[in-house]
Amino acid sequence: MRVLVIEDNEDFRKLALTWFQSYGIEVEGAANGAQGLALQRARPADVIVTDIFMPEMEGIETIHDLRKEFPEAKIIAMSGRDPLANLDVFEVARQVGAAKTFSKPFKFEDLIAAVRELSGAKEQRAP
């Protein structure tokens, strides 16, 4: 299984890459939506995890463009904004193609479970 993480916060992106790798999941990271689209075109991921609020190309636009080019893409949207404020933006994210949404902070194990569910992969515990 291969995962693409699109996240502008470098610390969070590096942490996510480390977590996915610890579960034996091949992962690549992008700092914004434009980079994410380029990586998806070059080496399509099974699941894409994207932040919603990013500079250059916001997550909603990224999800829309990913869905347009990759209609079968499995996409998870996440946001660190206030959970109540996220309700509306998560609804829009689902309307444009996100299968699941997460409010930061979240348990990384829950994200792993969602990625595995969407990809159809069997569970593997971190060492």
Regions found by a protein language model. Name each.
Residues 38, 60-72:
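Short amphipathic alpha-helix used as the core "switch/output" element in two-component signaling
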Residues 61, 82-102, 109:
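Alpha4 helix (beta4-alpha4-beta5 surface) of REC/receiver domains from two-component response regulators
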Residues 54:
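Receiver (REC) domain active-site loop signature in two-component systems and cognate sites
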